[in-house]
């Protein structure tokens, strides 16, 4: 089977069936989905009834089962990102969710409401920016992984050969993946970030590409998914690959990021920064070893760069991570702790050079992947930098962009694009492209995990910290606080539904969506607002004597402040918590 998927498709809809027609040159296949039996079959174009309503689509994301029955999810708009070794890369920008059922009359009012909520969850994930695909190229693998494949692998369909860590519609495609004959209709979709630029230095033109692949294992939102699971999958795991294509030569440099790989949590509780909790009873070494065993198999040597604070609430996590590495005693793993905030305080961001100098020799040892124009592998990357902070976002992005630039400097010199002694940061035009692309990558990763753009991107874009950047960081921090406390439960549920961590059972009489709120949820905020309002009224409408006014103000002031602290104490009752999948509670 050719390792391509159909690019041009038409969707024909009748009351009984969906017909997905392949319109590529020479194609005669039609995928038929029975809207009643849900059976999937393959036919030819002459089987499409002329009475069907027809529209163009650009790919099938898959199918999902909700309360009302099955739904077909299709890509309705796409945008060209660029060309990758003569393969077109697309970004999916709009989707449609089509019900198999013609009416909802078979549902009760409660089922209708639940179905509406599940649809909103599905659409929430689909509206998240960052879904990419190609009908001819396997985006889920790095250049180095693709170079080490067998002829049998290259004959597989894109879906079969894809790295399942990065196929975000894997659950939606489960029915199609069970039938190899329809795999050309099944499109593996990546979630993350891709940017491509044609660049020029010294009159030499090359393509520069940046790809971030988000893992769909232990996926979720900032405060609800931390650490690792029992299988060793780390939260917010992202593989970032930087690629250069010059005169037939291809070079790539891969880095990873992922949450501190022990069992810990940091549940929102209305505090600006909840204290992280390390599980006191879990077997940390078991999960830790599983995580790094798989990382070493996939990537080789691991150089861990831990950027968390060495004091305060982050200190126990740094100590635990260091202890785990020491206890494991693997020659394949090296550990570097760099207190980012301490080293760079008072906007001394030039001090990041201390870390770069510290790891320079290790980076040269890890090298990068390079294949020449004849297809011969010149060098392999022997391992990766695995960077992390608390969120694996802001501090991590800064460090990754600096490490990637150092690798790129070496690659471009080796390829003859840069002259001996020339520095990449002196190439103003390219530097602007480079910094903006890495800042855009930072924003994409941050929005997908934390719900807002990244912090510290002014440094990534300009090379220095600015006052405007500090103001924007403040705004994004406040926005994160709101989302993390009051909307992330819904976001987490949406991701769990999309990835199949939760399956809808319409026969289940107890809906997880209808969780009754405790009396405190409504009563305490109302009491606080009333008390605060009365305090203001007493200030504006003075009593007969100043002592009387003071007494009223003190009474209502103490009532409002007291209620505020009671709300804060019971913070976990007021946040928007996930309802579908109960993660391990680590308190």
Swiss-Prot record:
Residue numbers of N6-acetyllysine PTMs: 456
GO annotation, biological process: exocytic insertion of neurotransmitter receptor to postsynaptic membrane; neurotransmitter receptor transport to postsynaptic membrane; phosphatidylinositol dephosphorylation; vesicle-mediated transport in synapse
InterPro entries linked: SAC_dom
EC number, as in UniProt: 3.1.3.64
Gene Ontology molecular function: phosphatase activity; phosphatidylinositol-3,5-bisphosphate phosphatase activity; phosphatidylinositol-3-phosphate phosphatase activity; phosphatidylinositol-4-phosphate phosphatase activity
Catalytic activity: a 1,2-diacyl-sn-glycero-3-phospho-(1D-myo-inositol-3-phosphate) + H2O = a 1,2-diacyl-sn-glycero-3-phospho-(1D-myo-inositol) + phosphate; a 1,2-diacyl-sn-glycero-3-phospho-(1D-myo-inositol 4-phosphate) + H2O = a 1,2-diacyl-sn-glycero-3-phospho-(1D-myo-inositol) + phosphate
Tissue specificity: Detected in spleen, lung, liver, skeletal muscle, kidney, testis and in cerebellar Purkinje cells (at protein level). Ubiquitous. Highly expressed in brain, spleen, liver and kidney.
Name of the protein this chain belongs to: Phosphatidylinositol-3-phosphatase SAC1
Organism of provenance: Rattus norvegicus (Rat)
